Amino acid sequence: MIYRDFKGLKLSALGFGTMRLPVKNGVYSDIDEEKVAEMFSYAIAHGVNYFDTAWGYHEGNSEIAVGKALSAYPRDSFYLATKFPGYDLSNMGKVEEIFEAQLKKCGVGYFDFYLIHNVCEMNIDAYLNEEKYGTVTYLKKQRENGRIKYLGFSAHGDLGVMRRFLDAYGKDMEFCQLQINYLDWSFQNAKGKVALLDEWHIPVWVMELLRGGKLA
């Protein structure tokens, strides 16, 4: 396994995403936890130490399955990432409720990496309205308290949306997860987004390298 240094951490260059886990009878919400445990065991044995989940994956069950699978390993042997689901505007104003639930679902006391999920045209105004929702303020407080080790964001919006977000919160963001592949380098202007993040000295995490297998 190739590893990358991030603030002294040794992160596997290949992470394990959990948006498309094995399911039973084709039901997206019914995760096959036995198969997930087998997959995690294989990945860990081959050097993977970064696992990524999110509130909405598998209709809310991904975090639970991930927590169960990782409970077999020492907490300091892996890095766990999840996300605040601001892509659903009904979640704005519920950051504390959701964060506490995520800790319980994953069975952990802290998250190594926590992302503001899918900053885009639909939610940028809500994310910027700290007076009303206080999302970023709350998450920064959890970082201060050690319940989030590193705070970042993922983005599917256009370059202008990302620029607005960074103008407000760039100094607080420690990494960004972007959809990068040979199609989206130009189609979603990943090239321009990477250049903007470089100006802010924010490292990039790559997602959707094969667009869910569609580019394989």
Tell what function each PLM region has.
Residues 14-16, 43, 51, 66, ...:
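Conserved, mostly hydrophobic/aromatic
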Residues 20-34, 83-93, 122-128:
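Active-site mouth loops of central-metabolism enzymes
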Residues 119-216:
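Beta/alpha (TIM)-barrel catalytic core signal, keyed to glycine-rich beta->alpha loops juxtaposed to Asp/Glu
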Residues 104-126:
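Active-site groove signature of glycoside hydrolases
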Residues 1-78, 138, 144:
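N-terminal binding-site loop/beta-alpha segment at the start of enzyme catalytic domains
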Residues 76-88, 114-117:
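A short, structured active-site edge motif that brings together acidic residues
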Residues 7-10, 45, 67-77, 100-109, ...:
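Acidic (Asp/Glu)-rich catalytic clusters
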Residues 29-43, 91-107, 157-168:
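Short, acidic/polar
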